Curated annotation (Swiss-Prot):
Coiled coil: none annotated. Receptor for thyrotropin-releasing hormone (TRH). Upon ligand binding, this G-protein-coupled receptor triggers activation of the phosphatidylinositol (IP3)-calcium-protein kinase C (PKC) pathway. It is found in: Cell membrane. Disulfide bonds join C98-C179. SMART domains: 7TM_GPCR_Srsx. This is Thyrotropin-releasing hormone receptor. Belongs to the G-protein coupled receptor 1 family. The keyword Transmembrane helix applies. The chain crosses the membrane at residues 29-51, 62-83, 100-121, 145-168, 194-215, 267-288, 297-319. It comes from Rattus norvegicus (Rat). Pfam families: 7tm_1. Keywords: Cell membrane, Disulfide bond, G-protein coupled receptor, Glycoprotein, Membrane, Receptor, Transducer, Transmembrane, Transmembrane helix.
Length: 412
């Protein structure tokens, strides 16, 4: 008797001759509880740190929040029901649960794929077309794109409402209820293949091509200059020492920008690679079963496929913590119970020594401003007063210009 389930994610059909082994139940429950539990906590933390930290409300992080919400949906809708499946060996959520849970499963799966595609395109534009990125890669535009992604996937996944039904199988010693199709395999196999092509093959091909272009820019060619950075030019210095200082400062800022972009791109590339690898077993199984007269449904292999999917949805916060200093600091602050609700501006006093040239009765210098970067301060342009604090001497001399830098401490 042919009785297919909607997907191996919530597969509940048992072979007629044997019940699920006790060790299988124990391993399934243990792995699902640990992986899904940690994944749910981690993805909630990602959403909270981006929403609570103003500095982290960037276009890229906006897509990561969308990915975190999609992963939460997968972990809750696809992961946790497997615990009851393992305990009871049957579907216990009824007809409405069959419709809603399956809908949320595929909504989370497809939304995560679209979110990954969106931030891949965003990274490509930001690095390879920095001028266009000034108006294309903005936080407000990212929110609009995410709204479109979720609207599209929500409508697309409504297809499952018309395909699902409860299937009842009667065996010698048990009656098994499963959430499955009310149509034959000849009709739903093309749906699986379309889903495989649109939400897995095409995004992975696009990501491979775009990250190839990104790698060429970041690692083989000089990175295109940011127009905002180009506008912050230094005046020509009247001494050789000032010229060297300006050149060194500019090089440090440039190298810092390149290093930061490389690190962000590496982190996102790891997310994409893990998505491709961890989804491959399940996606491959679906395609293969579409062409088999008797689908392959070995319990331990199905468990392996499910665990790979749950790992993909749970591991992203770990990647952010390992590869992003900002996320790591934000996670630490979120876990700190003594964290203050608001952060006030912090004052910084810096002394700067450099040479000036005496012209008649006054000192003249070409260094009118400087860009200061601190671990906890935004890159800030500081202007200097004309009064030299040092004693006047004949010829070129060294004097100290004092200033007080007041800047709002960045929330990382």
């Amino acid at each position: 008797m042919e009785n297919e389930t909607v997907s191996e994610l919530n597969q509940t059909e048992l072979p007629p001759q044997v019940a699920v082994a006790l060790e299988y139940q124990v391993v399934t429950i243990l792995l699902v509880v640990v992986i899904c539990g940690l994944g749910i906590v981690g993805n909630i933390m990602v959403v909270l740190v981006v929403m609570r930290t103003k500095h982290m409300r960037t276009a890229t992080n906006c897509y990561l929040v969308s990915l975190a919400v999609a992963d939460l949906m997968v972990l809750v809708a696809a992961g946790l029901p497997n615990i009851t499946d393992s305990i009871y060996g049957s579907w216990v959520y009824g007809y409405v649960g069959c419709l809603c849970i399956t809908y949320l499963q595929y909504l989370g799966i497809n939304a995560s794929s679209c979110s990954i595609t969106a931030f891949t395109i965003e990274r490509y534009i930001a690095i390879c077309h920095p001028i266009k990125a000034q108006f294309l890669c903005t936080f407000s535009r990212a929110k609009k794109i995410i709204i479109f992604v979720w609207a599209f996937t929500s409508i697309y996944c409504m297809l499952w409402f018309f395909l699902l039904d409860l299937n009842i199988s009667t065996y010698k010693d048990a009656i098994v209820i499963s959430c499955g199709y009310k149509i034959s395999r000849n009709y739903y196999s093309p749906i699986y293949l379309m889903d495989f092509g649109v939400f897995y093959v095409m995004p992975m091909i696009l990501a491979t091509v775009l990250y190839g272009f990104i790698a060429r820019i970041l690692f083989l060619n000089p990175i295109p200059s940011d127009p905002k950075e180009n506008s912050k030019t230094w005046k020509n210095d009247s001494t050789h020492q000032n010229k060297n200082m300006n050149l060194n400062t500019t090089n440090r800022c440039f190298n810092s920008t390149v290093s930061s972009r490389k690190q962000v791109t590496k982190m996102l590339a790891v997310v994409v690679i893990l998505f491709a690898l961890l989804w491959m077993p399940y996606r491959t199984l679906v395609v293969v079963n579409s062409f088999l007269s008797s689908p392959f449904q070995e319990n331990w292999f199905l468990l392996f496929c499910r665990i790979c999917i749950y790992l993909n949805s749970a591991i992203n916060p770990v990647i952010y913590n390992l590869m992003s200093q900002k996320f790591r600091a934000a996670f630490r602050k979120l876990c700190n119970c003594k964290q203050k609700p608001t952060e006030k501006a912090a004052n910084y006093s810096v002394a700067l020594n450099y040479s000036v040239i005496k012209e008649s009765d006054r000192f003249s210098t070409e260094l009118d401003d400087i860009t200061v970067t601190d671990t906890y301060v935004s890159t800030t342009k500081v202007s200097f007063d004309d009064t030299c604090l040092a004693s006047e001497k004949n010829g070129p001399s060294s004097c100290t210009y004092g200033y007080s830098l007041t800047a709002k401490q960045e929330k990382i």
